[in-house]
Amino acid sequence: MKKYVLTIVFACLVAANVSAQAIYKEVVAMKAHVEKLMNDSTQNMQTRKVACFKNDALYYLIDKAADTPDFTEYMLGEQATAMIDFVNLYVKRLSQERKKKDKDIVLALFKNASCAHPLFDDPDKEVTYGYVDNEQYITQFALDTDW
């Protein structure tokens, strides 16, 4: 009976490890996709800049996840997906607004949500806030965000 239980436990551990590797590979694939989009000269500059932010945010997540012992691949996958969804929703909401003041309100709401919810509490604000006050990007969000 012990052997049977140990076999089941071992099988579950192996399955969990495969899932973790699959999640990590998916996040790396997401990064490769946005990097390709970022470097695609047939895309307009705004699309490429949004892809640049996504690329940097995914790189930041992967890097910080590797440095944080209790940060699992599952959490990495959740954060990566949430970041992509957050940015896509922001771009969609921004495109729906016609007046500059309404666009500014959307930007302020999303920017404040990003800055108010750090994930890693990274003290390096020069890196984490690199996009926050950069007028050249519509994605003025903190990289250290609990998406």
Describe each region flagged by the PLM.
Residues 21-67, 144-147:
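Immediate post-signal-peptide N-terminus of mature secreted/exported proteins
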Residues 74-147:
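Surface-exposed, polar helix/loop patches in the mature regions of secreted/periplasmic/lumenal proteins
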Residues 1-16:
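Sec-dependent N-terminal signal peptides
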Residues 48-93:
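Amphipathic alpha-helical interaction modules
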Residues 19-22, 74:
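A ubiquitous short alpha-helical element
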Residues 3-4, 18, 26, 32, ...:
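N-terminal cationic leader/targeting segments used for protein routing and processing
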